[in-house]
Design a protein with these regions (language model features):
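Left-handed beta-helix
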Residues: 49, 54-55, 60-61, 68-69, ...
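Alpha-helix boundary/capping detector
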Residues: 44, 66, 113, 117, ...
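Terminal amphipathic alpha-helical/low-complexity segments used for targeting or macromolecular assembly
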Residues: 1-50, 132-136, 140-141
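Short N-terminal micro-motifs specific to bacterial/archaeal maturation
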Residues: 2, 9, 27, 63, ...
């Protein structure tokens, strides 16, 4: 995938398209959840199966986002910037979480409400805060 620069016509079009889709998801979610889920999968082609989310969601570049299976996204998620973001399988994102470009959140992790994730979070970890930091491992099993 080539790097897109600010002012790039392709970047502007991708941004407009993503904003349009996310606005529609946020508008119809409670009246048409199946259609909202379909639009989410269009917005985020790298979305796994069994993802559960609550609006509003704010995702700038869904094509630069990978979300693993069985992930829960609480209300008011913000993923900003054009860097690739990876969210593992079975992750729980609390309400009002912000994720910055380039972050990887490991499988089976929990990100507390209001956290601002600026660095990678290991697998099987509870992490909270601004900036978000690991506070406790989650035992496997």
């Amino acid at each position: 995938m080539r790097k897109l620069a600010n002012g790039d016509q392709e970047l502007q079009e991708l941004t407009r398209e993503a904003h349009s889709i996310r606005a529609e998801i946020n508008r119809i979610y409670y009246d048409s959840p199946v259609e909202a889920q379909r639009l989410f999968e269009e917005l985020v082609p790298g979305a796994g199966v069994g993802i559960d989310f609550r609006p509003p969601i704010n995702i700038d570049y869904g094509m630069r986002l990978s979300i693993g299976d069985r992930t829960f996204i609480n209300a008011d998620l913000l993923i900003i910037g054009g860097g690739f973001v990876t969210i593992g399988d079975n992750v729980w994102l609390g309400g009002s979480v912000t994720i910055t470009p380039g972050v990887i959140i490991g499988d089976n992790s929990i990100i507390g409400a209001g956290s601002v994730v600026t660095k990678d979070i290991p697998t099987n970890t509870i992490a909270v805060g601004n900036p978000c930091r690991p506070i406790k491992p989650i035992p496997e099993g």
